[in-house]
């Protein structure tokens, strides 16, 4: 899939709306615990600055439910981003209003203004047309670099591109190119490993049955109503211990056998409560089997990456996607709403 890239547009001294993925974990002191997602935005931002662009950063943090939550301000993100960039990152006092408009007008080339948490405004999640128009009016060009939320029908993902020339940031381009290769020309057999607690993965598994050679299911997914129907398919397997916190020894051995023969492995979600010593065997042994295999390995989702990091194996994975749900939806559908939005020409 060929995406319009940030490098395809004339950005010289343009005001650019830059959708980043800054949904990062904060500690009890409200400091950023993991800077990975912020670091991932730096190459695209540096390219924008090289074009003397005036940048308006768009991002969300957690799920404040459409209202202002002091502890979910993007202030810690702005501070960390400022350190990484080596320049001031101003934070707007609001998502959208007169103060924001004034701050945008004051922007000079190679400067950046980060708008406050978009999810403080309920219209973001509703994909409100009026809100999209008002945000779009702040800039001249829209760049999406937030793969992890590009499966969402939100204003900052699919609404703004209706009104502005749009393109993908460097991170989004890499994600889409990598996953497209995996989807269109994988080394077989393809083994998909799904775990965790999100029911949406059951639907993803259902859609991937025709593409994958084996689907291995663990975590809480096996107790959901949709799972028994999936198990009837010969490609799908999974079993949970009675305590509901890990997969059984029989499942571990079965999964290890399938993984050894894999040509491509896609993994999203742990096999159980890996944070607890007594429940980490399923996730740990599957992780060990994955990195020992000769397969091309792709993981997605914060818990999966955290588990592999805990077991000291994350560096042995071939590709780490920034999004679990977005990765699975892309592999199931071949695209994402946010990807389609920047491919389409402006509608209005």
Regions found by a protein language model. Give the residues of each.
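Active-site loop-to-helix "anion-binding N-cap" substructures in soluble metabolic enzymes
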Residues: 1-348
């Amino acid at each position: 899939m060929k995406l319009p890239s940030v490098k395809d547009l004339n950005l010289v001294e343009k005001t650019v709306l830059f959708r980043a993925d800054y949904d990062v974990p904060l500690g009890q002191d409200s400091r950023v615990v993991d800077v990975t997602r912020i670091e991932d935005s730096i190459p695209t931002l540096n390219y924008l600055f090289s074009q003397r662009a005036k940048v308006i950063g768009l991002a969300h943090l957690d799920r404040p439910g459409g209202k202002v939550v002091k502890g979910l301000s993007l202030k810690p993100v702005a501070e960390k981003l400022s350190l990484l960039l080596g320049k001031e990152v101003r934070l707007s006092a609001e998502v959208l209003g007169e103060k924001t408009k004034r701050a945008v007008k004051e922007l000079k080339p190679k400067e950046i203004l980060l708008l406050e948490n978009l999810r403080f405004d309920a219209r973001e999640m509703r994909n409100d047309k009026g809100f999209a128009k008002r945000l779009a009016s702040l800039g001249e060009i829209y760049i999406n670099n937030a793969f992890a939320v590009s499966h969402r029908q939100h204003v900052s993902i699919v609404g703004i591109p209706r009104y502005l020339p749009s393109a993908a940031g460097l991170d989004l381009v890499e994600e889409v190119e990598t996953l497209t290769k995996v989807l269109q020309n994988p080394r077989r057999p393809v083994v998909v490993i799904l775990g965790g607690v999100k029911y949406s993965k059951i639907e993803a598994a259902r859609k991937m049955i025709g593409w994958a050679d084996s689907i291995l299911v663990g975590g809480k997914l096996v107790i959901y109503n949709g799972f028994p129907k999936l198990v009837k398919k010969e490609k799908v397997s999974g079993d949970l211990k009675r305590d509901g916190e890990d997969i059984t020894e029989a499942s571990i051995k079965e999964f290890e056998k399938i993984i050894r023969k894999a040509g491509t492995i896609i993994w999203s979600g742990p096999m159980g409560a890996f944070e607890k010593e007594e429940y980490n065997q399923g996730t740990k042994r599957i992780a060990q089997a994955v990195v020992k295999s000769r397969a091309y390995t792709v993981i997605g989702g914060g818990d999966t990456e955290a588990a592999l990091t805990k077991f000291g194996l994350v560096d042995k994975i071939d590709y780490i996607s920034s999004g679990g749900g977005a990765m699975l939806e892309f592999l199931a559908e071949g695209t994402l709403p946010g990807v389609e939005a920047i491919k389409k020409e402006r509608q209005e």
